[in-house]
A protein has these predicted regions:
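Alpha/beta-hydrolase-fold serine-hydrolase catalytic core, especially in secreted/extracellular enzymes
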Residues: 259-328
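Active-site rim elements
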Residues: 121-126, 208-210, 273-284
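The feature captures the conserved acid-bearing segment of alpha/beta-hydrolase catalytic domains
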Residues: 186-260
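Primarily recognizes the serine-hydrolase "nucleophile elbow" in alpha/beta-hydrolase
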Residues: 138-216
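Serine-hydrolase catalytic machinery in alpha/beta-hydrolase-like enzymes
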Residues: 47-157
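N-terminal signal peptide c-region/cleavage motif recognized by signal peptidases
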Residues: 14-16
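N-terminal cap/lid segment of alpha/beta-hydrolase-fold proteins
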Residues: 20-62
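Glycine-rich His-Gly loop
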Residues: 69-73, 167-168, 202, 226-227
């Protein structure tokens, strides 16, 4: 009788988990979920550096998890807004950073013929070091604003649940503050307040071992790239992007490879030099998987985790898209 009861209980639990997974929908948002946009500037007094940020605030008033986003080379806080809008509609405070020195100020006042040269020069070690220090500076200021009654962010932030994300140079920034070890020097810029990370167009180090760079990462990472994700600047090609996943050993890891997706797939518009037509389903997949990841690891949503750790993500993908995951 006891054995029969145990079997029935396990069957019921499996059925319940399956039902929760099948009903979970990372794309579902309410009609009243349009976020409020707040533009602010973080002043880093120690470095005398001003950092513009754009905050997508959800309609809820309770403290919500925070997701940071770092733009690619030449971008701004206004880029990839389709992500910020959706994440906020799902209940996250999405904070989009702008990094002076590697933002649109690099190219916008130059003749077209000079822009590529200027962008290449901005993809520098100096700007990398500025970026990885921008992230903790922003988190520090968010902690202050969260306690200031005069701030539009007062009481709105759950800073015990912080996700980090970024595209291209922003992915490099994300990797550095989320557990990467610099392959040559062994230096780390990890911010322990970050609990999960998404790298859009991740990169292996130019020199040194990817295994050394990523082998000690101990928080969940989601990696997204495309089969034609080659950056116009730098040496990051598809094999170097795929090497990141293989090098992660200690924490849950996920990888999406979108078929025929180019480097611009994670932005709002095509880039000069793109050869493939934009696939509208790519943004749907990006939003679904990133949201499920945040729900699982920032929202502690068991149904989202079960959905993510199953074949359900393939229901939003096209046949040739690739998906894999592992939990050590």
């Amino acid at each position: 009788m006891k054995l029969l009861f145990t079997a029935q209980l396990l069957l019921a639990m499996a059925f319940t988990a399956g039902a929760e997974t099948s009903s979970y929908d990372p794309m579902a948002i309410s009609d009243a979920a349009a976020p409020k946009i707040v533009d602010l500037t973080v002043h880093d007094a120690m470095r005398q550096r001003d950092l513009p940020i754009r905050v997508y605030l959800p309609t809820t008033t309770a403290p919500e998890p925070v997701v940071l986003f770092s733009h690619g080379l030449g971008g701004t806080r206004e880029g990839s807004k389709f992500m910020g809008e959706h994440w906020a509609a799902r209940g996250y405070v999405a904070v989009f950073l702008q990094h002076p020195g590697s933002d649109d100020s690099v190219w916008k006042n130059l003749p077209p013929a000079d822009r590529l040269r200027a962008m290449s020069a901005a993809a520098s070690l100096d700007n990398f070091l500025l970026r990885v220090k921008d992230v903790p500076a922003v988190i520090d200021q968010l902690e202050i604003w969260n306690t200031q009654t005069s701030s539009p962010l007062a009481g709105r932030l759950n800073l015990k649940k912080i996700g980090m994300s970024g595209h291209s140079f922003g992915a490099i920034t994300t990797q550095a503050v989320s557990g990467e070890t610099l392959a040559v020097t062994g230096q780390k810029f990890t911010d322990a307040r970050i609990t999960a990370a998404i790298a859009f167009s991740p990169s292996s180090p130019k020199t040194g071992s990817a295994a050394r760079a990523f082998g000690a990462v101990n928080i969940p990472w989601l990696l997204m790239t495309g089969t034609k994700d080659v950056a116009p600047i730098g040496n990051a090609d598809v094999p170097s992007r795929l090497a990141v996943y293989a090098s992660l050993k200690l924490a849950p890891k996920y990888e999406l490879v979108l078929n025929n997706a180019e480097h611009s797939v994670f932005t709002d518009r095509a880039l000069p030099g793109d050869r493939e037509p934009r696939n509208p389903n790519h943004h749907r997949v990006i939003l679904a998987l990133s949201t499920a990841f945040w729900d699982a690891y920032l929202g502690d949503d068991a149904a989202a985790l079960a959905w993510l750790n199953s074949d359900r993500p393939r229901t939003v993908m096209e046949t040739a898209d690739q998906w894999q995951f592992a939990a050590p």
